[in-house]
Each structure stands twice: as structure tokens, then as C-alpha cells.
């Protein structure tokens, strides 16, 4: 299955220096040894910690400050009918210059103050970013499957990923910002050739998908029903 227009990528888009973004102190989310990669257990505890200890900070103050982890809902789009996934490439017009020309499995972005007015901030941020980034005529279901931390890159050191597996009820998906992104859907086997050109987060997620993340999603502690994004 191919997407109907070029596609999206890692949720570090909308880089507005004056925006406030949801952060949590690094020492709070990692009270002991800092781990690297994906964690698939204890997600309920992580959600409780984020809800209790996070706060909004000016983005320009935390963009290069690894003591504060910017919370990023990170959506992997999966079509279960043919077992394909959305993979994208960030173009030069993308706001996140550190990720230009890299491939990604994820779509999403920062959590802003308005996201917590009607919903849990993480849920509100997820729903808003889905509407802003994706064109999807059908409803979709998002399930939290992992927490992601990656310290080997400047981008990774200041962001904390909440990885959601998102499955549309039907039909193709596309992205709105086609001047920033391009992409298509394909099987994991077909996208293997892009692995070395993927963002580090996407490499970790790719490995987890091969290890069975879709089957694990049924036990997710957080399930969000996303409305159509026409």
C-alpha cells in the first residue's frame, strides 16, 4: 500500500523558539542508572511520573539542556491488513535541521500547554499532532508500546519518546506538510535497505517492531481513539 501524498517523520517539528513544551527532569524519569534504547515494561509508572512531575518550559531554554527531557508522543503508523508501515524522509524545508534527509518511522511532536486543557497533556498532544501532521479519513487507534531514550545524538539527548503504535481503521494515510516530508508505506523487510539512513529513534523502533511490538500493543496501558483527520 502506498500513501496518497508524501509523508511525515519524527515529532520534533514545529520548532518555534517562543513555545512552551512539556518537560520532565532527567533525574526524575531516570532516578537510578540511565538506560539507552526502548523500555516496554513499567509504562504505567512512567505515565504517572510524567503526569505528576512534568512542567512546561520555554523551548529555547531546554533545546540544548539534557537535564530536561522534552516529552514527545511518537507515532508509528501500521496498516495491519497488509502489515505495512509508514516511512518518511525529512526534506530541507523541515524545521529540525539536525534531521534533514534522514528516514523516520515516527510522526509526532512536542506537548504544548493547550494540549492539557481538555485531555491528559500526553493524550492531548498526541491527538493534536495527529491532526496537524497526518491526513487520515478514517478513525485510528493509538496504543502506547514503549518508552524511548537515546543519548548518542544531540536531538536524542534532550527528548524522551512515548512510542505509540497507531492503526487506522481503513484506507491510506498521507501527511499535510509535503514541502517538508516525503514517504511511503512498505513492509519491514522492504524498508531494511533504509536502516542505516534512519534517525536513531527509528532504528530502535524498527528493531522493536521486528521483535513483536504489534502483538504486545494489545496489552498497552494507554489506548487513545483518534478521530478522522480529513
Language model region names:
Residues 2-38:
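Short, extreme N-terminal leader segments that mark the start of a protein/domain
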Residues 3-13, 28, 100-114, 146-230:
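Nudix hydrolase/Nudix homology domain
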Residues 15-16, 66-70, 156-158:
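A short catalytic or substrate-binding loop motif that flags glycine-/basic-rich loops and adjacent residues
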Residues 19-21, 72, 159-163:
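Short hydrophobic/aromatic beta-strand or adjacent loop that forms the aromatic wall/cage
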Residues 25-29, 78-82, 168:
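Short, flexible beta-strand-to-coil junctions
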Residues 36-82, 90-94:
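Acidic, metal-coordinating catalytic segment for phosphate/diphosphate chemistry
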Residues 83-132:
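Conserved Nudix-box catalytic region and its N-terminal flanking loop in Nudix hydrolases
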Residues 137-146:
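A short coil-to-beta-strand element that immediately follows conserved catalytic motifs
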Amino acid at each position: 500500500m502506498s500513501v496518497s501524498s508524501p509523508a511525515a517523520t519524527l515529532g520534533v517539528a514545529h520548532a518555534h523558539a517562543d513555545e512552551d513544551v512539556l518537560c520532565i527532569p532527567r533525574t526524575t524519569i531516570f532516578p537510578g542508572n540511565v538506560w539507552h534504547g526502548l523500555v516496554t515494561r513499567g509504562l504505567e509508572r512512567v505515565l504517572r511520573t510524567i503526569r505528576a512531575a512534568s512542567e512546561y518550559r520555554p523551548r529555547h531554554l531546554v533545546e540544548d539542556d539534557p537535564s530536561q527531557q522534552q516529552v514527545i508522543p511518537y507515532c508509528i503508523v501500521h496498516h495491519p491488513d497488509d502489515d505495512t508501515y509508514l516511512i518518511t524522509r525529512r526534506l530541507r524545508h523541515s524545521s529540525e535541521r539536525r534531521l534533514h534527509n534522514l528516514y523516520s518511522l515516527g510522526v509526532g511532536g512536542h506537548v504544548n500547554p493547550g494540549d492539557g486543557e481538555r485531555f491528559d497533556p500526553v493524550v492531548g498532544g498526541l491527538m493534536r499532532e495527529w491532526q496537524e501532521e497526518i491526513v487520515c479519513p478514517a478513525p485510528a487507534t493509538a496504543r502506547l508500546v514503549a518508552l524511548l531514550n537515546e543519548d548518542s545524538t544531540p536531538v536524542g539527548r534532550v527528548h524522551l519518546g512515548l512510542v505509540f503504535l497507531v492503526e487506522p481503521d481503513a484506507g491510506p494515510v498521507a501527511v499535510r506538510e509535503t514541502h517538508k516530508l516525503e514517504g511511503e508505506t512498505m513492509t519491514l523487510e522492504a524498508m531494511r535497505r533504509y536502516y542505516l539512513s534512519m534517525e536513531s529513534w527509528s532504528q530502535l523502533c524498527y528493531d522493536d517492531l521486528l521483535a513483536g511490538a504489534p502483538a504486545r500493543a494489545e496489552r498497552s496501558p494507554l489506548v487513545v481513539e483518534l478521530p478522522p483527520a480529513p
